[in-house]
Structure formats: structure tokens, C-alpha cells
């Protein structure tokens, strides 16, 4: 093997299409665009969803649903995430300070997910039935 004998393996390099460069290339004259029509012209294209003037499907089908504004101010927090915190008394301010929830969140619900490792006191937070049982069985309290 010498430097002058090195060449790329077969099929690894492909020549680009040279459009409009003679009849023998296979892409001469019309350059692969066919004859006439909007798509053969320069700058000639149709917008996404255009169906030739027919009412497009995205306008034929009715709108449905909505985006709730409540989801921007509510959050669910796992019990396992809370048990990793250094403090025993947990409220909205603590969760925001520890970057568990966003600063815009106003309502939090604690859900049972993972293991509880310490006795916690929750203040002013909503709790699911399973999470409540887990906290109380471990010696924790839920206030307010």
C-alpha cells in the first residue's frame, strides 16, 4: 500500500448531479424537471398543504380541544424527589428554592412514586391518597 494507490472504497463517494450540462448527462436541457408546469419554473413551488385550489384537509377538518392555562401553574411532584431534600418541613417556597418546580407554579400535588426515605412534614400542598398513606406510615404529617 502506497500513498499514490489509496482510493476511496467503491460506492462510498458519489458524484453530484450536474444539471443542464448536455444531453449525454441525462440531466441536460430540462435538468430533470420535465416539460412546462409550475414545478418546472424557477421559484415555482406550491405551499405545504396546497391541494390545487381544493379546500385543503387541514381546513376541512374542524378544530378541537384547547390548551389549559391551568397547566402552567400546577405541577405534580414525586415523593421520591421530595425525600431527597435536606429539610423536613416542605412547602411551596422550599420546592421553588430547591428547583424542583418552576417559579410560576402555584399549586402542587405530591404523588406516590418511588421510596420515601425520611419522615416529612408537608405544609399547604395537595397529596394523593397513596402518598398520604406512605407519609403517615413513615411518621410524617400533612398540615393545611
UniProtKB/Swiss-Prot annotation:
* Database matches in Gene3D superfamilies: 3.100.10.10
Positions with biased composition (Gly residues): 21-31
InterPro entries, per database record: Ribosomal_uL15, Ribosomal_uL15/eL18, Ribosomal_uL15/eL18_sf, Ribosomal_uL15_bac-type, Ribosomal_uL15_CS
> What one GO molecular function would you report for this record?
structural constituent of ribosome
Region (Disordered) location: 1-51
- Comp. bias (Polar residues): 1-12
Its GO biological process annotations read: translation
Kindly give the Pfam families that the UniProt entry links to this protein.
Ribosomal_L27A (PF00828)
> Keywords for this entry?
Ribonucleoprotein, Ribosomal protein, RNA-binding, rRNA-binding
NCBIfam families in the record, alphabetically? Answer: rplO_bact
What's this protein's function?
Binds to the 23S rRNA.
PANTHER family reported for this sequence: 50S RIBOSOMAL PROTEIN L15, LARGE RIBOSOMAL SUBUNIT PROTEIN UL15M
Which family does this protein fall into? Belongs to the universal ribosomal protein uL15 family.
User: What is the protein's given name?
Assistant: Large ribosomal subunit protein uL15
The protein's organism comes out as: Buchnera aphidicola subsp. Schizaphis graminum (strain Sg)
UniProt lineage: Bacteria, Pseudomonadati, Pseudomonadota, Gammaproteobacteria, Enterobacterales
What gene does the UniProt entry assign to this protein?
rplO
